[in-house]
Amino acid sequence: MSQNILLLIRADIKAVDEKVDALQQAVNDVSANLPDTSELSAKLDAQATTLDTIVTQVNNINDVLNPDLPDVPGNLQKQQQQKKSNKK
């Protein structure tokens, strides 16, 4: 009777071993079929760099088209208003 139990245990171990082998093969297949993300990462990094360059250029254009003008001092502002009213 103890031999029968040992045979059953041995058969169970063999079945588990076969399942582990099948699972390992499936893992190997999945690993082999994973896409290479390094190329995709490199392309995304290049696009991010290009986007940063474009943003910088747009900001420079915006600064040129919309410069910060200093406030006109009070006495000059009055003179300009008087000139405008004299022209009318």
From Swiss-Prot:
Pfam families: NPV_P10. Keywords: Late protein, Viral occlusion body. Residues 65-88 are annotated as: Disordered. GO terms for cellular component: viral occlusion body. Residues 77-88 have a biased composition (Low complexity). The keyword Disulfide bond does not apply. Seems to be involved in the morphogenesis of the polyhedra. Forms extensive fibrillar structures in both nucleus and cytoplasm. It is involved in the liberation of polyhedra from infected-insect cell. This is Protein p10. It comes from Spodoptera exigua nuclear polyhedrosis virus (strain US). The lineage of its organism: Viruses, Viruses incertae sedis, Naldaviricetes, Lefavirales, Baculoviridae. The gene is P10.
